[in-house]
């Protein structure tokens, strides 16, 4: 029997009785956000909306984005990254489990000095991929051009936020590069590794 999304009691200020809300809504009220799936337009838009709402509600309290993601679509991921840079509160990024592909890009986008990985977390970077099956030659050429632009954008962000030279990041993005939490810290993707 699946348990679904757990519900927890929550009492709004000024109310006598607590109401039961799903755990994620309760945690959102504490400014704790979760990316626990592949990045797509739906989850990206939900997180963007939450970040903007919470920023408007109080732009002095930091946001905390917990990441356990296998990656996903580039454009929704870049939109989420851009929002993290746009909102006034600092966005802490915390990798638990894995932050692969677009997940690692969002992880590196946290406020510098406020990016953390749990001790057994895994991080993976690589170049963006396209879907070339059943594409006409003209469309293929356009898609390759767009992919090259996206790759350059992602590479420059990694360079800026990790402090690694362009040639190192470019070379590493040629293939899947997996890292432990301490290796991700040495690379500059995270600033701290949580202690066990």
UniProtKB/Swiss-Prot annotation:
The free-text function statement in the UniProt record for this protein reads: Cleaves peptides in various proteins in a process that requires ATP hydrolysis. Has a chymotrypsin-like activity. Plays a major role in the degradation of misfolded proteins.
Q: Where in the cell is it found?
A: Plastid, Chloroplast stroma
Q: What Pfam families does the record point to?
A: CLP_protease
Q: Kindly state which keywords UniProt assigns to this record, in alphabetical order.
A: Chloroplast, Hydrolase, Plastid, Protease, Serine protease
What this protein catalyses is: Hydrolysis of proteins to small peptides in the presence of ATP and magnesium. alpha-casein is the usual test substrate. In the absence of ATP, only oligopeptides shorter than five residues are hydrolyzed (such as succinyl-Leu-Tyr-|-NHMec, and Leu-Tyr-Leu-|-Tyr-Trp, in which cleavage of the -Tyr-|-Leu- and -Tyr-|-Trp bonds also occurs)
Q: Which GO terms describe its molecular function?
A: ATP-dependent peptidase activity; serine-type endopeptidase activity
Q: Does the keyword Protease apply?
A: yes
Keyword 4Fe-4S assigned: no
Protein name (record): ATP-dependent Clp protease proteolytic subunit
- Record's subunit section: Component of the chloroplastic Clp protease core complex.
GO CC field: chloroplast stroma
State the similarity comment: Belongs to the peptidase S14 family.
InterPro entries, sorted: ClpP (IPR001907), ClpP/crotonase-like_dom_sf (IPR029045), ClpP/TepA (IPR023562), ClpP_His_AS (IPR033135), ClpP_Ser_AS (IPR018215)
Provide the species name: Lactuca sativa (Garden lettuce)
One biological process term in Gene Ontology:
proteolysis
- Which PROSITE patterns does the UniProt entry name for this protein? CLP_PROTEASE_HIS, CLP_PROTEASE_SER
Chain coiled-coil ranges: none
Q: Which residues form the active site?
A: 101, 126
Q: What are the EC numbers?
A: 3.4.21.92
Q: What is its main location?
A: plastid
């Amino acid at each position: 029997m699946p348990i679904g999304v757990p519900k927890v009691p929550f009492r709004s200020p000024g109310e006598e009785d607590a109401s039961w809300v799903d755990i994620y809504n309760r945690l959102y009220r504490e400014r704790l956000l979760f990316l626990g799936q592949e990045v797509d337009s739906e989850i990206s838009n939900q997180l963007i909306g939450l970040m903007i709402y919470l920023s408007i509600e109080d732009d002095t309290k930091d946001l905390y984005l917990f990441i356990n993601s296998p990656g996903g679509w580039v454009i929704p991921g870049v939109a989420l990254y851009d929002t993290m840079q746009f909102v006034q509160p600092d966005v802490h990024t915390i990798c638990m489990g894995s932050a692969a592909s677009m997940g690692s890009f969002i992880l590196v986008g946290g406020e510098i000095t406020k990016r953390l990985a749990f001790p057994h977390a895994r991080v993976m970077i690589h170049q963006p991929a396209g879907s070339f099956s059943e594409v006409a030659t003209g469309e293929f050429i356009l898609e390759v051009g767009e992919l090259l632009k996206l790759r350059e954008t992602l590479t420059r962000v990694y360079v800026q936020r990790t402090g690694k030279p362009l040639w190192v990041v470019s070379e590493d993005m040629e293939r899947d590069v997996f890292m432990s939490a301490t290796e991700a810290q040495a690379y500059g993707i995270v600033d701290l590794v949580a202690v066990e």
